[in-house]
């Protein structure tokens, strides 16, 4: 490898010598992968937001947090086409400096937002199961909305620095748009990239382990609804690890190489730089997989799809429009299917989707308001009126 070719990878960023690569492999492989993530993520999160906004008949704190998670994922997904175009052009940004800053800010903000709200969902379920009588389980929807706004404020505060400086850098004939680079320095931005993973990871693993242990101690893990709840908890942890761990591991390896080798020979970093951008696609995949979290969060979501599919099939068979039914598909949960399962785990599948639940004469509503009078067998062990 001649010296001239090695120098091609050097780029001065903020008066520091950095290594920057424009890899043909990324240009060929990542755009199709990101395209699939965009399609499935847009469909999944778009449908989730549609259900939240138009078919949810009442709100609870846990659903407010899930709604914010869906918003974060949706905002990240709509930025993917710009990144796809960037990779197709072999890391050559054609939209100018301000759009470059905005897209990188949106990616960083919504990546962090997804992490934060996944963590909040795990903590919320932890308190409802392990500490069912804790005051946090009784927070109002208004309080949950304020907490969500504060979390968004923290997220914006930690990523707004990406809007303040120029991130579009001339690299030969190409314009490179990057917020992460291989430089012999450890910046605050990169430190946060690691901290925002390991701290939530510890919290999510702790909450998941305590919930499963608590249920098994009370010999409740064999109940069908409890098994579904345990599946939900495990899905949250698995999605988090699969999507965010690979890029963090590669970034740590880059820091180690910088500490031991410096930036004198950029060829040392070619493979790890390629690995980092590939693992970043796993990060974007989080927005595609989070709808699985919504699906397992409550029987209401699969019930909704079952109801929608059944109505569509019925109309197709009869060949006539269903004029006697509302064009809005609403779920009416089956209380017989959910009786006896802890509310903290099944998220009240039988009530918020049904308009009758809101009626003053609803028996379900009456029992929920005075559940200490006739608690179900499993609710006695977990505590009632916890959601």
Curated annotation (Swiss-Prot):
Q: Tell me, in one coarse class, where this protein mainly resides.
A: membrane
Region: Disordered, residue numbers:
319-343
Q: Which residues lie on this side of the membrane: Extracellular?
A: 1-28, 86-102, 164-194, 257-273
Regions of this protein lying in the Cytoplasmic compartment: 51-63, 124-142, 210-236, 299-387
Membrane-topology annotation of the record: Multi-pass membrane protein
Q: What does this protein do?
A: Receptor for 3-OH-octanoid acid mediates a negative feedback regulation of adipocyte lipolysis to counteract prolipolytic influences under conditions of physiological or pathological increases in beta-oxidation rates. Acts as a low affinity receptor for nicotinic acid. This pharmacological effect requires nicotinic acid doses that are much higher than those provided by a normal diet.
What keywords does the record list, in alphabetical order?
Answer: Cell membrane, Disulfide bond, G-protein coupled receptor, Membrane, Receptor, Transducer, Transmembrane, Transmembrane helix
Full protein name:
Hydroxycarboxylic acid receptor 3
- Residues passing through the membrane, by range: 29-50, 64-85, 103-123, 143-163, 195-209, 237-256, 274-298
**Any single GO BP term:** G protein-coupled receptor signaling pathway
Q: Which GO terms describe its cellular component?
A: cell junction; plasma membrane
Look up what happens after changing residue 111 to A: Abrogates completely the activation by OH-octanoid acid
Cysteine disulfide partners in this protein:
100-177
Going by the entry's taxonomy, the superkingdom of the source organism is recorded as Eukaryota
Molecular function, one GO term: nicotinic acid receptor activity
**Tissues showing expression:** Expression largely restricted to adipose tissue and spleen.
Q: Does the keyword Membrane belong to this entry?
A: yes
Compartment(s): Cell membrane
InterPro entries per record? GPCR_Rhodpsn, GPCR_Rhodpsn_7TM, HCARs
Q: What is stated as this protein's family in its record?
A: Belongs to the G-protein coupled receptor 1 family.
């Amino acid at each position: 490898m001649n010296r001239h070719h090695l120098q091609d990878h050097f780029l001065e960023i903020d008066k520091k010598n950095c290594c920057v690569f424009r890899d043909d492999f990324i240009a060929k492989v990542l755009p199709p992968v990101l395209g699939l993530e965009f399609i499935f993520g847009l469909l999944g999160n778009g449908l989730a937001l549609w259900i939240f906004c138009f078919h949810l008949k009442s709100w609870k704190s846990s659903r407010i947090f899930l709604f914010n998670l869906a918003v974060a994922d949706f905002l990240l997904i709509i930025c993917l086409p710009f990144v796809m175009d960037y990779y197709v052009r072999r890391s050559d940004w054609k939209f100018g400096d301000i759009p470059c800053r905005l897209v990188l800010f949106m990616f960083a903000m919504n990546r962090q937002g997804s992490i934060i709200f996944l963590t909040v969902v795990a903590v919320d379920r932890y308190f409802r199961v392990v500490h069912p009588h804790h005051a946090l389980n009784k927070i109002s929807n208004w309080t949950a909305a304020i907490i969500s706004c504060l979390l968004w404020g923290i997220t914006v505060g930690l990523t707004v620095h990406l809007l303040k400086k120029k991130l579009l850098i001339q690299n030969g004939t190409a314009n490179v748009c990057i917020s992460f680079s291989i430089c012999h320095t450890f910046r605050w931005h990169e430190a946060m990239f690691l901290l925002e993973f390991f701290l939530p990871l510890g919290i999510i693993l702790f909450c998941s382990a305590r919930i499963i242990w608590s249920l098994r101690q009370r010999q409740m893990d064999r109940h069908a609804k409890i098994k579904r709840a345990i599946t939900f908890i495990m899905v949250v942890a698995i999605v988090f690890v699969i999507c965010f761990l690979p890029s963090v591991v590669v970034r740590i390896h880059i820091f180690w190489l910088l500490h031991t080798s410096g930036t004198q020979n950029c060829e040392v970093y070619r493979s790890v730089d390629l690995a980092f951008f590939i693992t970043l696609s796993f990060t974007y995949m989080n927005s595609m997989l989070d709808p699985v979290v919504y699906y397992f969060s409550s029987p209401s979501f699969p019930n909704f799809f079952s109801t929608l599919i059944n109505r569509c099939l019925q109309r197709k068979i009869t060949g006539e429009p269903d004029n006697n039914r509302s064009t809005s598909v609403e779920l009416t949960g089956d209380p017989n299917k959910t009786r006896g399962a802890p509310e903290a785990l099944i998220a009240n599948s039988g009530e918020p989707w049904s308009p009758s639940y809101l009626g003053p004469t609803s028996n379900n509503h009456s029992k929920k308001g005075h559940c200490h009078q006739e608690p179900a067998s499993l609710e006695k062990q977990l505590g009632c009126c916890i959601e």
